Structures are given as C-alpha cells and as structure tokens.
C-alpha cells in the first residue's frame, strides 16, 4: 500500500484466502532505501506494485519527493528487502511484467502509458520507452498493469483522477508493445454513473487482477467511503470484488462493473488468523510493523524499556513540514474506535509536552497532550491546528504523575478525554472529523 511521508514505507500484507489479512512487514525499513526528508503528506511513496518471478519478489514504486521510480527485491517476504535500484522511465504507478526471461516496465510519463524493457536487478533500461495507450480520454491515465491470458496482452489502467470521477479501463493486443484495442464496454469498473450514485463506496479505481488457486479471478481496487456530505474519513481503502473472465473475452467485474460493501460469492477455504490483542504492551525488542514515524525517524529518540515506550523530546513539532518530530503512530483502520495510553513526563522542562494526536498532516491535527508548567505543575491540553489557525480548545491543571489520555472516534467526532486514576475519565471536548 502507498505510505507517502511515513516510515517504514510500503506496508506488506499476506493472506491465504483473500479474506483474512495480516501485516507481515514493510518493504522499506532503512533510510538507505528511501529518503523522506522534506516529504509532505502529498509526497513520499506512491502506489507500489509487487511481482514474483523465478524465486524472487520485486517491489516497484515511486518516491515523488526524491529519486522517482525504483525497485527493491527479496527472496523472503518476512525478511529484509534489497537496496533500491533506480529506473530511467518516469511517470508514477510503475508496474512490472515478466515473460520469456525479459522484464517489462509500464508507467505513465507524459500523461500516457509507456512501455520499455529493463533489467530488474540493476534498473538499467534496455529498450526505448514506447507509448502504447492513451486510455479512453479520461484525465490522468495511470496505474497500468499488464496481464497475459489466451494469447492476449491485457493492459489495465485507471483514469479520471482519484476522487468521484475515478474509473478502471482496459485494452488488449496480440503484442506486448501494441497496438492496443480499447474494450468497447469501458470502463469495466466505476461508480461515476447513475447506477452507483447512492452507493456508500465512491471514487472506485486503481485496480489489480489476481487469480486464486482455484482458478477464480478477483479484482482489488481503491475507493473511499463518504461519511457526512462529501467528507471521507479513512481515505482510500482497499476493496476486493469477484470478476468473471471467460476465454478470449473481456473481464467483467461483479456482474455490472460496480462493487458493494457485501457481495455474495463462493470463497476459498477460509484460514482465519489467530486473534490479536488490541493492546500494545511494548514488551518486544522492537515496535511491530504497524507502527510508523513521520518521515525518516531518529532512532535514538525511541527506546523500549521494561514494557514501556520511552520517547525523547525533540525541538521539532507536529507542525514541521520538513523534519521528523518524535512521533510514533498507527493508521486509523476503523471509523469507530477507542485509543488509550498511559503516559508520564519525566525530567521535563517548562513548556515540554507529550501526548496523543489525531494527525492527518502538519497543517491538520488534533492534539491531546500533557504540558509541563513552570511551577512544577502540569496541565492536560486540547489543541488543534487547522491550516493557518492554531487554537487551544481547553486546558486543565492536573496533579504530577501518570496521566491516561483517550481518544474515542466515530464518523462525526473525535472525543478527547483524560484520567488521573486510570478509571474515571473526564471529557475535555469533541472535534469534528471532517477537518482531519
């Protein structure tokens, strides 16, 4: 999945039945693999693609803040990935296709889909880039992938941008470098038409095909779920839908080219995962793969000691748009949730602060934190940053010692609470979800 300004980059998930998924690691775990300094929420890592060939996994992606398109590889999905090799062909959303000992790269430089042959181990471009399809006329043709079936090369792309006009289109050719014939029934997946106007899923696009072990075909795509009005809370999420792909035919997604929150289809034999505790006790030697930092972190500021996570304060705030603050966080996975932490300031100077934040980017975040005061007292503070506006919503003096901070979320509001005894939480205020 895209990881933008967050480090480690490119979270990697695994499933044996396409239903139960678990994160098994991240592809980019070392600063030498990815530089995110100066990356905004719109920067960093875009749209990775993973491919397997002859015993090796390849991941190709784009660092739009630094060196553009690059590849890393591994023979062990649970281990470390290689150092990156850059590729010459530009654009975003690169993808790889392997056939006959050759590796082909497709991406979208110059607002069209282009193809070239490369060496995936060195990144060297072996042939000139060739324009192979412009799409169907929608803006931003991107996210290309090539599949071969029944001696046809199928070229799958996204068009229309990533909001409500998003769509998936497809073309095919007898030759990998074209010419490609557009599907007369394009788009094969979209929610821009009247038949999906009231669908709770919108902005559907950027798709991949996968064939399961039983021969069934599935499509994975990105979309968002609007909450109130045009606001969507969890960003672009990954959806899975059934697909029929008959011999020599065009693929048909879920019967009518739309998807739903519930779709009744035969499934693979289910292999549920062991239930994990929602609690993180910090008793391991390192943080789990789900924890991330803003940009490349400073490891010396993070220590796991006796079941506690010790964070060293730094002179970089959450408002900084270039450097890395002392921050460790998790992506919000659910509309309704509760997040609680027990914390204590130690060796703090006046104005030092630490706490919980609901963070979208450096200019949009809600902060619930404990602040050290000059008279050896401390305060629990609720503050927000929205664009150019920073405001302290509420501040309460509390005794020195451990403080419990809690954020409760739903589709409309985040509620911010604190406790000094670990049991009796007091609500400071609630903030609207639409602004972050």
Report residues per predicted region.
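Carbohydrate-active catalytic/glycan-binding domains of CAZyme proteins
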Residues: 1-436
């Amino acid at each position: 999945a895209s990881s933008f300004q967050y480090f480690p980059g490119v979270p990697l998930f695994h499933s044996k039945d396409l239903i139960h998924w678990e994160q098994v690691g991240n592809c980019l775990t070392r600063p030498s693999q990815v530089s995110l300094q100066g990356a905004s929420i719109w920067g960093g890592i875009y749209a990775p693609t993973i491919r397997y060939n002859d015993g090796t996994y390849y991941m190709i992606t784009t660092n739009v803040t630094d060196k553009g398109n690059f590849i890393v590889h591994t023979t062990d999905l649970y281990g470390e990935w290689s150092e990156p090799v850059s590729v010459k062909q530009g654009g975003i959303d690169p993808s790889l296709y392997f056939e006959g000992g050759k590796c082909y790269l497709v991406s979208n430089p110059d607002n069209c889909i282009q193809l070239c042959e490369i060496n995936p181990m060195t990144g060297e471009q072996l042939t000139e880039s060739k324009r192979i399809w412009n799409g169907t006329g929608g803006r931003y043709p991107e996210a290309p992938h090539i599949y071969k079936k029944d001696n046809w090369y199928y070229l799958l792309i996204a068009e229309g941008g990533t909001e409500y006009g998003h769509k998936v289109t497809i073309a095919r050719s007898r030759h990998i470098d074209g010419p490609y014939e557009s599907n007369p029934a394009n788009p094969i997946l979209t929610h821009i038409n009247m038949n999906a106007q009231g669908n709770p899923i919108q902005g559907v696009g950027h798709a991949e095909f996968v064939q399961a072990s039983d021969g069934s075909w599935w499509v994975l795509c990105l979309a968002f779920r609007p909450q109130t009005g045009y606001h969507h809370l969890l960003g672009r999420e990954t959806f899975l839908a059934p697909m029929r792909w008959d011999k020599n035919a065009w693929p048909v997604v879920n019967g009518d080219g739309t998807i739903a929150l519930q779709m009744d289809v035969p499934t693979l034999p289910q292999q549920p995962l062991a239930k994990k505790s929602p609690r993180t006790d910090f008793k391991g030697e390192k943080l789990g793969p789900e924890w991330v930092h803003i940009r490349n972190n400073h490891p010396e500021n993070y220590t796991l000691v006796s079941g506690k996570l010790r964070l060293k304060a730094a002179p970089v705030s959450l408002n900084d748009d270039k450097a890395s603050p002392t921050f460790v966080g998790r992506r919000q996975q659910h509309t309704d949730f509760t997040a609680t932490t027990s914390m204590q300031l130690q060796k703090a100077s006046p104005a030092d602060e630490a706490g919980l934040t609901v963070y979208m980017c450096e200019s949009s975040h809600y902060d619930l934190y404990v602040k050290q005061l000059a008279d050896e007292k401390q305060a629990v503070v609720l503050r927000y940053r929205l664009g150019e506006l920073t405001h302290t919503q509420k501040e309460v003096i509390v005794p020195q010692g451990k403080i419990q901070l809690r954020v409760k979320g739903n589709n409309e509001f985040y509620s911010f609470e604190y406790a000094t005894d670990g049991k009796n939480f007091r609500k400071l205020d609630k903030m609207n979800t639409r602004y972050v």
